[in-house]
Amino acid sequence: MWPQDPSRKEVLRFAVSCRILTLMLQALFNAIIPDHHAEAFSPPRLAPSGFVDQLVEGLLGGLSHWDAEHFLFIAEHGYLYEHNFAFFPGFPLALLVGTELLRPLRGLLSLRSCLLISVASLNFLFFMLAAVALHDLGCLVLHCPHQSFYAALLFCLSPANVFLAAGYSEALFALLTFSAMGQLERGRVWTSVLLFAFATGVRSNGLVSVGFLMHSQCQGFFSSLTMLNPLRQLFKLMASLFLSVFTLGLPFALFQYYAYTQFCLPGSARPIPEPLVQLAVDKGYRIAEGNEPPWCFWDVPLIYSYIQDVYWNVGFLKYYELKQVPNFLLAAPVAILVAWATWTYVTTHPWLCLTLGLQRSKNNKTLEKPDLGFLSPQVFVYVVHAAVLLLFGGLCMHVQVLTRFLGSSTPIMYWFPAHLLQDQEPLLRSLKTVPWKPLAEDSPPGQKVPRNPIMGLLYHWKTCSPVTRYILGYFLTYWLLGLLLHCNFLPWT
């Protein structure tokens, strides 16, 4: 059973501790700091609220700000406004499942309170499982238990922390993505395809994950070229690639089609409560009962592309304005981290990168012992994935979302810092000399759990190397600052 694994047990314990501290701090910050009056989506509350609802709002209201309001609104009312379709249905559906489990309390709690409780509890669960999934993935890819352990612990202190706790889809997406990657590394291709498809139903950038499947299948094809029937192998490759692309793209396509039926087909509109209609009038939100929007007449009517362009001004270099310099500075640490990771890997394995990870050496007859850890040949496809996300995010998106965008999508953001810590922190080697401590008295005889080396470094902060201070300083600063600002409607999105 996986909980009996010592390192995974410590990862799970640390994840639980970090989640509890996160929830406590967001409640504290939300209580003592007045909310900033931001120009954000803020729909009216239709149901009356009692004392218990006010208590839930006071304890968990910090999790409902910025984009979280969209997810909560969609879970409660469905996709009423055109711009709601920027948010994929996977997470709202998960919240609805959570509220069904709270149905016995509906006489005491409003639907919104049930949704807030679902946000806190489900993201708590998703985060813990994602940390364990990242640890397991690291063991499979890095072949270095220490780096896998460090990376999973760093994930618990992620700079994207507040978005992994609040009513955002990042925690669920990270769980599905890391789990899908792990299944693919185990050779369970179609389980991986299914998990990647679910991830695409949670966030649109799940579509990029098709690259993992294509690379894995191409590796299998080239390794079988010496077989007697290469044409048959080529046909199998093409069929497998088609099925992978089709399966991963299906959730996205179905979601776009659903939007088309709501806004572009006559008679598909459903009744909307009058206060929400008035909100649409006041704010200029488009609802299905009005004139057909322009995207309905496109050759390929994609509401998602239209919304990103018209509502959020997302596009190539559109965000490159002088007034956005603070947001570029906010995104700079994660951009530097991923760019540094990419450069380190490419300069270490130039031939591997030139051959797209399909050939490790110019001379196939002399196979050197492969590197372990972050520099392992298996990491190539993950580095490419991270670099593509960074390039797209940096050129086409609101750059301030890069931290949560990368922090929930790529293990490179945690593997590379773990590599730097192991490579450049002498204190870790001294900590390894006493790496175990006994479990509680009720544990099996001889069972031990590893010390938490990240906490050990924090305890010995003054003697840590500069690289360690930079890494942990960045992680902890964003971990805490994100809670402080985001939970009070201050600009941390």
Swiss-Prot record:
Question: Quick one: a GO cellular component term?
Answer: mannosyltransferase complex
One of the GO BP terms on file: GPI anchor biosynthetic process
- Source lineage: Eukaryota, Metazoa, Chordata, Craniata, Vertebrata
Its subcellular locations are: Endoplasmic reticulum membrane
Tell whether Membrane is among the UniProt keywords: yes
PANTHER family, A to Z: GPI MANNOSYLTRANSFERASE 2 (PTHR12468:SF2)
List all topological domains (Cytoplasmic): 1-13, 99-113, 158-161, 214-234, 349-378, 491-493
Q: Which domain of life is it from?
A: Eukaryota
What protein family is recorded?
Belongs to the PIGV family.
- Specify the protein's topology with respect to the membrane: Multi-pass membrane protein
The record's principal subcellular location, in a coarse class, is endoplasmic reticulum
Q: Where are the transmembrane segments?
A: 14-34, 78-98, 114-134, 137-157, 162-182, 193-213, 235-255, 328-348, 379-399, 470-490
Lumenal side, ranges? 35-77, 135-136, 183-192, 256-327, 400-469
The role this protein plays is: Alpha-1,6-mannosyltransferase that catalyzes the transfer of the second mannose, via an alpha-1,6 bond, from a dolichol-phosphate-mannose (Dol-P-Man) to the alpha-D-Man-(1->4)-alpha-D-GlcN-(1->6)-(1-radyl,2-acyl-sn-glycero-3-phospho)-2-acyl-inositol (also termed H2) intermediate to generate an alpha-D-Man-(1->6)-alpha-D-Man-(1->4)-alpha-D-GlcN-(1->6)-(1-radyl,2-acyl-sn-glycero-3-phospho)-2-acyl-inositol (also termed H3) and participates in the seventh step of the glycosylphosphatidylinositol-anchor biosynthesis.
Pathway of this protein? Glycolipid biosynthesis; glycosylphosphatidylinositol-anchor biosynthesis
> A GO molecular function for this record?
glycolipid mannosyltransferase activity
The entry's protein name is GPI alpha-1,6-mannosyltransferase 2
Top-level enzyme category: transferase
Keyword tags: Disease variant, Endoplasmic reticulum, Glycosyltransferase, GPI-anchor biosynthesis, Intellectual disability, Membrane, Transferase, Transmembrane, Transmembrane helix
Enzyme Commission number(s): 2.4.1.-
Name the associated disease, please: Hyperphosphatasia with impaired intellectual development syndrome 1: A severe syndrome characterized by elevated serum alkaline phosphatase, severe intellectual disability, seizures, hypotonia, facial dysmorphism, and hypoplastic terminal phalanges.
Q: How is it modified after translation?
A: Not N-glycosylated.
